[in-house]
C-alpha cells in the first residue's frame, strides 16, 4: 500500500475523492434524469431543487442544529476531561494507575450494540432519553478513554524539565501546565477535538436508539427520513449529505490553522 501511494499518489487522491464527487453529482441531478441518463460523470442538466427542498421542506435544519450542538459540546467536554486524565497519567505515579488504564481499555472492547440496552435503561429513569443532554453524556463517556490515551502520548513527548524549571521559578503546578504545557500541546488538543467532533457528528446507533423524538434527532438519523418503505429520495439524501459535510470541512480547516500555530508556538516557547 505504501509503495502504491508513492508511485501513484494522483490515483489514490482520485480514489479517495470520487465518492464525494459522486455525492455532489447526484445532489444536483434532477429526479427525471437520475435513472433515464444512466451512468454519467456529470448530468446534462443541473438543479439546486434538492437543496432547496431539504432546507425548506424537511426537518434537516433542526437535525443539523442538534448535531452541531451535540458534536461541539461533546468535543469540548471530552477534550477537557481527556487533557486532565492524560496529564495525570503522564506526570504522576499513583497506586492503581495501571488498573485504571486497563479498565479504560476494556471499555473500548465491547461492541456498542451489546451495551445499548443497559445504557437505555440507565438513562430512561433519569429523563435523559429523547434529549441532547443524554447524547452528550454518552458520547463524552465513550470518547474520553481514547482521547485520554491520545493526549497522554502528547504529554509524554514533552520533557518534564520544562515544568520543573517553571516551578523552580515560583510557578505552581497549574500555572506551569497552563503557561508551558498547554501551548506545547495545542496540536494534540486540536487533534483530539477533531477526532471527537467527527465521531460525535457521524454517530448513528446511539442517536437512533436513545431518541424517538424528531426534536432531539441528529442528522445521521435525519438522513433515514429520506428512505421510505417503497422508495429512496436519492437526490435529497445526497443534498443533505453535502450540507452535512460542510461544517466538518470548515471545522478541520479551522483546526488545521491552529495545528500550525500550535507547532510554531511550541517551538518558540520550548
Segments (PLM) and residue ranges:
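A structural signal for multi-pass alpha-helical bundles of membrane permease subunits
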Residues: 2-270
Amino acid at each position: 500500500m505504501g509503495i502504491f501511494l508513492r508511485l501513484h499518489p494522483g490515483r489514490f487522491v482520485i480514489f479517495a475523492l470520487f465518492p464525494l464527487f459522486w455525492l455532489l453529482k447526484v445532489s444536483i441531478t434532477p429526479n427525471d434524469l437520475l435513472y433515464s441518463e444512466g451512468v454519467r460523470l456529470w448530468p446534462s442538466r443541473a438543479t439546486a431543487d434538492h437543496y432547496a427542498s431539504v432546507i425548506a421542506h424537511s426537518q434537516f435544519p433542526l437535525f443539523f442544529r442538534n448535531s452541531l450542538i451535540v458534536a461541539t459540546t461533546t468535543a469540548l467536554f471530552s477534550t477537557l476531561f481527556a487533557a486532565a486524565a492524560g496529564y495525570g497519567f503522564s506526570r504522576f505515579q499513583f497506586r492503581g494507575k495501571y488498573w485504571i488504564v486497563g479498565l479504560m481499555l476494556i471499555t473500548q472492547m465491547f461492541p456498542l450494540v451489546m451495551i445499548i440496552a443497559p445504557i437505555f435503561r440507565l438513562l430512561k429513569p433519569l429523563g435523559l432519553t429523547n434529549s441532547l443532554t443524554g447524547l452528550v453524556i454518552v458520547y463524552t463517556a465513550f470518547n474520553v478513554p481514547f482521547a485520554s490515551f491520545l493526549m497522554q502520548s502528547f504529554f509524554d513527548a514533552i520533557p518534564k524539565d520544562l515544568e520543573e524549571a517553571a516551578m523552580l521559578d515560583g510557578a505552581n503546578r497549574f500555572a506551569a501546565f497552563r503557561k508551558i504545557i498547554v501551548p506545547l500541546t495545542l496540536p494534540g488538543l486540536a487533534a483530539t477535538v477533531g477526532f471527537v467532533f467527527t465521531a460525535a457528528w457521524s454517530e448513528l446507533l446511539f442517536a437512533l436508539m436513545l431518541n424517538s423524538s424528531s426534536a432531539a434527532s441528529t442528522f445521521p438519523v435525519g438522513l433515514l427520513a429520506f428512505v421510505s418503505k417503497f422508495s429512496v429520495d436519492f437526490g435529497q439524501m445526497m443534498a443533505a449529505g453535502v450540507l452535512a459535510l460542510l461544517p466538518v470541512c470548515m471545522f478541520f480547516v479551522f483546526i488545521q490553522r491552529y495545528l500550525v500555530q500550535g507547532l510554531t508556538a511550541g517551538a518558540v516557547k520550548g
